Amino acid sequence: MDAALGPPEQMAELEEDLTPMMAQYYELCRQYDDALVLFQVGDFYEAFCAAAKRVARLCEITLTQREDSTGEYPMAGIPIDNAESYVETLLDAGYRVAIADQVEDPDEVSGVVERAVTRIVTPGTLTESELLGGADNNYVAALTAGERYGLALLDISTGDCYATSVGSESAVADELSRFGPAEAIVGPDVDVDRDAVFGPACLVTRYDADAFAQDRAEDRVGQYFGPPERLLAGGAEIRACGGLLAYAEYTRGSSGAVGPDGEPVDPDVDPAGTLDYLNHLTRYDPREYMLLDAVAVESLELFKRRSVRGHENRTLVDTVDETACALGRRKLTDWLRRPLLDADRIEARHGAVAELQRDPATREELSALLAEVYDLERLISRVSRGRANARDLRSLAATLSVVPDIRDHLADADARLLADLHATLDPLAETREEIEAAIRPDPPQQVTEGGVIREGYDEELDRLRSTEQSGKEWIDELEASERERTGIDSLKVGHTSVHGYYIEVTNANLDAVPEDYQRRQTLKNSERYYTPALKEREDEILRAESAADDLEYDLFCAVRDEVADEAERVQALADRLARLDVLVSFAEVAAQYDYCRPTVGSDGIDVTAGRHPVVERTEDAFIPNDTHLGSGPVPASRDGSDDGVTADDIQPFLAVVTGPNMSGKSTYMRQVALICLLAQSGSFVPAKAADLPILDRVFTRVGASDDIAGGRSTFMIEMTELATILDAATENSLVLLDEVGRGTSTADGLAIARAVTEYLHDEVGAYTLFATHHHDLTAVAAALSGATNRHFETSREDGDVRFDHELAPGPAAASYGVEVASMAGVPDSVVERSRDLLADAETADTGVEATRETEVASEPRPGTRADSETDSTATETTGPTENGAASAPAGEATSDDHAQEVFQTNGAAAEDELPESVAQQLASLDVATMTPIEAMNALADLQDRIE
């Protein structure tokens, strides 16, 4: 996108010769050089020169030419009445749009009409309902840097404002992934990877340093929200909020605002309205909520589908959304993106949901009443900015009228949250009564053309209307009286906006025209006249109409201002109605889809018959599965103490999950995460029973693709995500790993997978689900005291593989990769050749991985591994054991040489075969202090030396 969108260079050269109107346009383009200026000329918004070419191309409208004393130049115009759709197109193309309106009445100005930029439309500062396109929040973010990053977010359309500070670039990305801002401004001190932090869809602008200056930021925060030192924690947050407010003022055209380049912007008028409704700032600490980083938000498909195929494009928020109003939809999204860590708050939500679930009649009545609630947050935003029309006020009054009924349905509530809502729902009776007394029930869209104020509200307005009406009645009677007086039966009395009232006589009757008729207009077949009496009545009507319209508009504005004074109360009411709507929605989902009330605060994840909330809606027969992780004592290494816990006492907290593709591994792992997330958001969960811990974070390493633009391969992306998990996961985290180690050699992949498994088990102790096709890894799980093997069962019918989607103990006996290839439509010749190669691999060491793998013993480390039951001399078996690896008959090779070396760790036999230097290096490694990456590098070095 060009840095400036103003007129081309020739206009600068001809600046002194420009017409007054084009000089005005050029000056606005220069002042708002970061935006595309749409310049009102009558009923159109025009763009000229280079900007006209862009507008015509993007909006698919005709490019014309304008000619004046300076020559010809391109021009493109869009009708004001349909401007929103064209503005949306320009926004989608990545442009900001500066709206320059006529701020004078052309009929009252002899020279050029004055114009001013009344608002700047950007992706993150939309307030127009037509452009917002839905109930979801539309945030603009501001970021500053220092010892910590300061982050502020604002939805101008609703007034929602948040602020926080974090310590790293990745933490900034995590917080932004929660809110998904459409636009961001950054201070001059911010140096981050834009795509990685903000994402490619976010419009990012480097804003002027003065806007982020500490003193100015403190003044702005204080002006809107109160003393910043009481609201925010540190200068970074204050600077971020100050810069964000400065940008909001700039886009609203506020007097004294500062543009991106630091230059003051001081238009003559402020039609976009004030930001006085911004009166509540929420400062939050990310550590108070379950942390969902950008990877988890994407892979769990909380708010956006990764693929447009399947599942009816449903996300989690779509699936559990039974909210009745826009307020509830936004609040639901907020609760899901910030699951709670406080058990009392979680239980309070569950208690309210339980009471509503038990009472379907109340739930249905509340839902019906909430469906009558308009979007109060956006309504009061428009009211406060002076952009609301009479219909907006009636919508607000209609919402207030249902609040008493909502309160009545909560009068007998026992649940704490419901009782609190009953006590605090404010019906704003005086505000509703004032609106209903002043505004007609079905007012026109425009507030300047009359018909807005009720009769009886204002005596002077009633008098003017009476004068206007009596004058029109006199005119209505004039036609009959003049026909009688003149004897002209075809005589008509009419009105045009240009010539006013007239008496029309056809040419055939001109001889009968009285002397007091004065000619007003000549037509082809008739003449139009007026009389002194008609002119007098017309002037009287026009004076009354004009005075009534002016008075009516003044009265409307006064009512609107009174409502704006109650903005804080309206916003508080909106928040409470939104919370109630979400609780009712949770209860409705629980009742319709058989969700259970979870118990939170347990020592482990214990789910009976759990289901994936999204997938179960799209499949006729979803197979539920149990999950049991870490509900017993933990290994000594998890809490740093040695309390005498033995391997026999440990309930596994790490599960290695095997099974063919399409068997359900990924769905199952995501299902566990979504159940935990829903529970901590306050919802019931899709299961028969659920005892859950309070998770501090959910990590996902599920699927990846190349980042070609960033120069990162799939494997590099996977390792980067893995490093984040190993560095940040705690014993209270849930880790989902799917196929770690792809994109490199089998030996490297197995080595990494094993090292990661051991580190998560020995050092982190996080609740972990590790899906893999590396069946050698099942031997590692069998040897770890806090780990277990689980697999998805398959069966055969008439030689075909059937996926049962049932989770069972032990590892899978085979991968069924060839069968899956056949089901996918791979040519028969390739499938048959694959079967031949696989058969060879099962009978000889050909370097092709077999489908059944040899159990390899691993000597346990004291206090963390099981021992005797995984001895390498165990009885030969051909099927999976309860927790052991699937084993093949003695002597049957099942994996390539490198993979066997990685997993052959049993005692002196292997060590005797190692070169002495390798053995010495191996003995010198301090495994207890090595990081996972250091361990992987050391292992790779040893492999190179052995080879």
UniProtKB/Swiss-Prot annotation:
The keyword DNA damage applies. The keyword Transferase does not apply. ATP binds at residues 659-666. InterPro entries: DNA_mismatch_repair_MutS (IPR005748), DNA_mismatch_repair_MutS-lik_N (IPR007695), DNA_mismatch_repair_MutS/MSH (IPR017261), DNA_mismatch_repair_MutS_C (IPR000432), DNA_mismatch_repair_MutS_clamp (IPR007861), DNA_mismatch_repair_MutS_core (IPR007696), DNA_mismatch_repair_MutS_N (IPR016151), DNA_mismatch_repair_MutS_sf (IPR036187). Residues 623-643, 841-916 are annotated as: Disordered. GO terms for biological process: mismatch repair. Keywords: ATP-binding, DNA damage, DNA repair, DNA-binding, Nucleotide-binding. PROSITE patterns: DNA_MISMATCH_REPAIR_2 (PS00486). GO terms for molecular function: ATP binding; ATP-dependent DNA damage sensor activity; damaged DNA binding; mismatched DNA binding. NCBIfam families: mutS1, PRK05399.1. Belongs to the DNA mismatch repair MutS family. PANTHER family: DNA MISMATCH REPAIR PROTEIN MSH1, MITOCHONDRIAL (PTHR11361:SF34), DNA MISMATCH REPAIR PROTEIN MUTS FAMILY MEMBER (PTHR11361). This protein is involved in the repair of mismatches in DNA. It is possible that it carries out the mismatch recognition step. This protein has a weak ATPase activity. This is DNA mismatch repair protein MutS 2. It comes from Haloarcula marismortui (strain ATCC 43049 / DSM 3752 / JCM 8966 / VKM B-1809).
